[in-house]
Amino acid sequence: MALKLMIQGTASSVGKSLLVAAFCRIFKQDGYRVAPFKSQNMALNSYITDEGLEIGRAQAMQAEAAGVKPSYHMNPILLKPSSDKKSQVVLRGKVYKNMSAAEYHQFKPQLLKFIKEDFDFLASQNDIVVIEGAGSPAEINLRDRDVVNMGMAEMVNAPVLLVGDIDKGGVFASIAGTLLLLKENERNRIEGVLINKFRGDIEILKPGLEMLENIVHKKVLGVVPYMDVHIDEEDGATERFYRRSTEGDIEIAVINLPHISNFTDFEPLAKVPGVKLRYVNKGERIGDCDVVIIPGTKNTIGDLQALKGYRLDKEIFEMRKKGKFIVGICGGYQILGKVIKDPGRIESTTSEIEGLGLLDVETVIENEKTTTQIKAVIRNNLPSILSPLRNIAVEGYEIHMGKSRILGDCQPFSVITHRNGEKIEVYDGCISDDGKVFGTYIHGIFENREFVREFINIVRKSKGLSPIEEIIDYKEFKEREYDKLADIVRKSIDMKKVYEIMERYKD
């Protein structure tokens, strides 16, 4: 069986996902076969595997760092919040049902079998499995049915490293408090502490580390600096929404919907020279920009109502009159249509709602969820303004619970040629007559270098700007960032001690 290492944190957003990715890349660099694992993930940012199964985006990112293909075994349970009180439960990559928090808490013991089987499968195929916890292990009201923190560590007999975030302040109290609330056998399983996101002079911190070790009787195995790495990270979502790209000739505004999903779709745009990417958050106006993007959402009807409530629909209509580019991805594509129908009340109590009406499309929400990896070709009869996009091949994935039907003479945007490796020919998306508004179900479309370059150059041409000749290859860029992440963490942590700890827990 494989060696095991589990990363738990004193709270959410302390950097567990990124550290798991770092360990995955370090072990890969050291010649080991390694896989990430998180028994239960709660996230709206998801990924579709080669088999057409849905997992958390963080585990797909960690698999990339490990140099292996993402698999549903790496994240057997995915919870996708659809409201403040309910989540869609995705079990082994497929939708199981919607549950309230109370219902799910009662259901958790039935999931142990699936979790153990999937972990054992990864352990049989790899030399090392790096496990990520969720939130904090010290949620004492949830401990009796825990399947993701200490319950998980005990199930597979994994050693635990506890991570604290010093950037927010209070790191010593959070570490000591977490250990205080754990049972003795759980404290004994924690083999070391990691201080994450440190800025400043390490010499000033050292006395505090010594005092902490004397108080909690745990060794600090490393202090990891605040890292400027550009990697898809779920915990970085809030920070990302308030971050602004540097000044540029082209400004792109992404509407931060209440239930925005797969926000990583737009990260490649931020890496394009001359592009300023920003998110329009609650209470903010769209303002002056060249492109408005309405992203995917886990609750299309609810987020359309919110968009109208914020009066952003009025601004979008003004953008349309000014001839700006308006793009919808997945749920955003549905929002751009004329009407969204939900006869089964799957998303809300509203059976029908008017869309923005910028595309001649009708969407019906259905129980069956489409989850596929796809290959597509942009259609060759796009309006002249978008002619540089014609016949460009793209790859991406679909995640949606509705089907959209083009009304009237509106033209499709692309032709899907492959779904999960099987050849097909299905139209996708829709485009306005003048080419200034288009929608697609293809997540990840902006990770296709040629498509992004030509689209940005179309926008640049509309402003009288010269074209950009080349942009970075996003996949190569991410590989460099994984290596950079691993180098920083390797230099900051006692890796010899980490290997010794894993060997002691070897089955």
Curated annotation (Swiss-Prot):
The active site is at residues 330, 443. HAMAP family: CobQ. This is Cobyric acid synthase. GO terms for biological process: cobalamin biosynthetic process. InterPro entries: Class_I_gatase-like, CobQ/CobB/MinD/ParA_Nub-bd_dom, CobQ_GATase1, CobQ_N, CobQ_synth, GATase_3, P-loop_NTPase. Coiled coil: none annotated. It comes from Thermoanaerobacter sp. (strain X514). Pathway: Cofactor biosynthesis; adenosylcobalamin biosynthesis. Residues 249-451 form the GATase cobBQ-type domain. PANTHER family: COBYRIC ACID SYNTHASE, DETHIOBIOTIN SYNTHETASE. Catalyzes amidations at positions B, D, E, and G on adenosylcobyrinic A,C-diamide. NH(2) groups are provided by glutamine, and one molecule of ATP is hydrogenolyzed for each amidation. Keywords: Cobalamin biosynthesis, Glutamine amidotransferase. Belongs to the CobB/CobQ family. CobQ subfamily. PROSITE patterns: GATASE_COBBQ (PS51274). It comes from the Bacteria. GO terms for molecular function: ABC-type vitamin B12 transporter activity; catalytic activity.
